[in-house]
Amino acid sequence: MRKIAGRSPVFFEKKRYLAAMKATVLEKFKVLAESAKYDVSCASSGVTRRSRPGDVGSTAGWGICHSFTADGRCVSLLKIMLTNVCIYDCAYCINRRSNDIPRAAFTPGELTELTIEFFRRNYIEGLFLSSGVVRNPDYTMERMVRVARDLRTVHRFNGYIHLKSIPGASPELVAEAGRYADRMSVNIEIPTERNLRLLAPDKSYESIYRPMSYIQQGVLQSAEERTRFRHAPRFAPAGQSTQMIVGATDERDRDILLLSSSLYARPTMKRVYYSGFIPVNPYDKRLPALDKAPLVRENRLYQADWLMRFYGFRADEIADERTPRLDLEIDPKLAWALRHPEFFPVDVNRADYEMLLRVPGIGVKSARLIVTSRRYRTLTQQSLRQIGVVMKKAQYFILCRELTSGQGVNELRPEQVRRLLTAPQRRRSDKNEGQLTLF
């Protein structure tokens, strides 16, 4: 073969080989990115890492899959599976063993190179990696750890890495994964063990909770070591998260929220994600016959989750024994206020911060501003609007200079207040039927 412009035949052979290899990798990418889209537990990263000279990537940046840093900035992640081949046959999963779908598997080296290539082209700023279970949990986990280790040690990748821990993986592999990952997660999937065994007979709560405990031990031990040694290695500094599927089984919202509350009691659990059940396997008679995912219910659970995390509500207050399912027409905070008119009206010029948080239309930021502002002046409707209070809701539950008793939830009755607040919403939903509104 003749040399062209100083290039040897070996050079062109290598070029053809690399082109063929990349085409194969991209075919795998199409299959495995599609298989990964049903995992929602990567909406926030919760970490910012400092860069060092020579490092590649960053956890901080601006809008693949989007996540958010601790300071609220958006980063894009390569959301991918190492393989969608799986030995399990979970009823709710598109990648179940018995499904006839396109299958693919990356080698750890291929996925490492793909991640770096995507980063260098400014497509991504991090990696969210999950996998089907091949052979056994330890074999799969070891290959996932190899990807994270090579990214950190060989390529000096400093971007965000979220690793899904495989249920049943050994403590040694979970410990090694935590040294390279920013966040780790183990999906609970089904909120009760009885239904988990029904839909995923190969799994158990023990195999799920055990890796959770390993992660928690690693995070707490790392935090203790860093109090004594400044440069001690960090272990999953953004903590851990989990995900539950909503609507695949008969659990009540109360059951789901009580489980979430117990998970948040763990010191390293940062987020619980709720995924509306998508009927990807309609032929399985163990699953409910749904036309579409229960998006409104999913949204209400996220709102209830927010109330538990930031507003001081308990799970058994949001969904009690008499109302174990969340109201799909109104948000959980308003539903609680209408069930408990005895707590209202609240005088915004005197009420404590905790009670202000329970008023519909008042958020965390607004409550703080109210407490600060009333030191210097008496608050009025206008000043509350300027602070950011949603007066359309709050007017029925508060007292201020212009709002006095006589027009609140107790005088108008909760049923009437509910009708007044939901009438505009019904008109909007009639115009936008089928579209879930965000506000």
Question: Language-model features: where?
Answer:
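Canonical Radical SAM [4Fe-4S] cluster-binding loop centered on the CxxxCxxC motif
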Residues: 80-109
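Flexible, acidic/Gly-rich N-terminal and inter-domain linker regions that tether
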Residues: 2-85, 390, 398, 406-430, ...
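Residue-level signature of tetratricopeptide-repeat
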Residues: 373-374
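Conserved AdoMet/S-adenosylmethionine-binding subsite of the radical SAM
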Residues: 112-117, 135-318
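Alpha-helical ds-nucleic-acid-binding substructure associated with the helix-hairpin-helix region
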Residues: 290-293, 307-345
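C-terminal extensions
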Residues: 325-355, 381-439
